[in-house]
Amino acid sequence: MSITLSDSAAARVNSFLANRGKGFGLRLGVRTSGCSGMAYVLEFVDEPAAEDTVFEDKGVKVVIDGKSLQFLDGTQLDFVKEGLNEGFKFTNPNVKDECGCGESFNV
């Protein structure tokens, strides 16, 4: 099982954590949403729960709850700039289908 980050994603997360002044790492999860069923959730976490799984890549701790892990195993998190837009991009090998707007996915 693994979660990986690109260099740009790791730099961005570390920058956010430094500006925030505290935090254990980044929580990555899924929630029911959109036309394809699931959407990604990113939030800072100050302390992982006992049932969480913690991955570390490039100095960033990524925390995932047990329910989300089955849908996220093998995911790579990247931070990309496209024109005037920038944001996190997920490359998830478990995704079978995505909605047209790119906001949700199905596994």
From Swiss-Prot:
Residue sites binding Fe cation per the record: C35, C99, C101
One Gene Ontology term, aspect cellular component: cytosol
Single GO term (MF): iron ion binding
Cofactor(s) recorded in Swiss-Prot or TrEMBL: Fe cation
Keyword set, alphabetical order: Iron, Metal-binding
Transmembrane segments: none
One protein family per Pfam: Fe-S_biosyn
Cofactor binding note of this UniProt entry: Binds 2 iron ions per dimer. The dimer may bind additional iron ions.
Quaternary data: Homodimer; may form tetramers and higher multimers.
Function statement: Is able to transfer iron-sulfur clusters to apo-ferredoxin. Multiple cycles of [2Fe2S] cluster formation and transfer are observed, suggesting that IscA acts catalytically. Recruits intracellular free iron so as to provide iron for the assembly of transient iron-sulfur cluster in IscU in the presence of IscS, L-cysteine and the thioredoxin reductase system TrxA/TrxB.
Matching NCBIfam families: iron-sulfur cluster assembly accessory protein, IscA, PRK09502.1
Family classification: Belongs to the HesB/IscA family.
The protein, known as: Iron-binding protein IscA
Native source organism of the sequence: Klebsiella pneumoniae (strain 342)
Species lineage: Bacteria, Pseudomonadati, Pseudomonadota, Gammaproteobacteria, Enterobacterales
